[in-house]
């Protein structure tokens, strides 16, 4: 996710000395940008709200419906919707049309947010994902039933809180056991480019879809090699 406040969201967030944007309580709805995906012919993966939350309590249902209308009219694109408020997403889920190209996710930074996962599991999206970024603690015994993708990443920028490698490996092992695609985004830190995004000497870019079967086959192949 972007670490800085873009011009589009100017006035909606302020920065602390750590460099992290903090929501100032004002909601700005960009109606002009809603139909832009309709003009994009080639397929794209679109992260709907990099610095916002579609299911914030101040966002009117009429606006949410318009966003979903556009997403349903663009089957060529994949829309990733991330929220920290899955309780509202679940509350209005039955009023929305969930096309296969609409992926619904929630943020899980620590185990204290496991209730978000349980709420997400009840939302009728074809793909449900977890964003464990920034990962701020271990996530043991994650409830992964009905979860189709897990993203993990460390916090970046000045004042970023460190992420332990054991936390990342713990999540990866759980994903492997449940055949859930695992995507490792970054180690983060003040110099995130230098820290890179390799885990155990390689990058992990698994995603839902055809790559799920590919990942299963690769794991089965690796297990058979170990047995031999």
Task: List PLM regions with ranges.
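Alpha-helical scaffolding segments of alpha/beta enzyme cores, especially the outer helices
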Residues: 62, 66-69, 91, 119-122, ...
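Structural preference for beta-strand elements that scaffold enzyme active sites
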Residues: 45-47, 78-80, 101-105, 127-131, ...
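Short loop-to-alpha-helix "cap/lid" segments that border enzyme active sites
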Residues: 94-96, 100-148, 162-169
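Auxiliary Fe-S-binding modules of radical SAM enzymes
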Residues: 4-11, 136, 141-228
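Conserved Radical SAM active-site core
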Residues: 1-102, 111-114, 139-144
């Amino acid at each position: 996710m972007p670490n800085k406040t873009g011009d589009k969201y100017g006035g909606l967030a302020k920065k602390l000395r750590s460099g992290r944007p903090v929501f100032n309580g004002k909601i700005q709805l960009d109606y002009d940008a809603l139909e832009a995906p309709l003009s994009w012919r080639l397929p794209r993966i679109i992260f709907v709200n990099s610095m916002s939350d579609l299911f914030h309590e101040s966002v009117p249902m009429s606006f949410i419906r318009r966003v979903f209308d556009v997403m349903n009219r663009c089957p060529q694109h994949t829309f990733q919707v991330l929220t920290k408020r899955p309780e509202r997403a679940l509350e209005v889920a039955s009023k929305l049309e969930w096309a296969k190209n609409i992926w619904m996710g929630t943020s899980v930074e620590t185990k204290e947010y496991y209730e978000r996962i349980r709420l997400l599991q009840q939302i009728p999206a074809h793909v449900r994902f977890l964003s464990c970024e920034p990962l701020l603690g271990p996530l043991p015994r994650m409830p992964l039933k009905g979860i189709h993708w897990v993203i993990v990443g460390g916090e970046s920028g000045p004042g970023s809180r460190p992420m332990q490698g054991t936390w990342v490996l713990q999540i990866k092992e759980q994903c492997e056991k449940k055949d859930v695609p695992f995507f490792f985004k970054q180690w983060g830190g003040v110099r995130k480019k230098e820290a890179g995004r390799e885990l155990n000497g390689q990058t992990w870019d698994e995603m839902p879809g055809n790559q799920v079967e590919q990942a299963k086959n690769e794991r089965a192949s690796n297990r058979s090699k170990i047995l031999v």
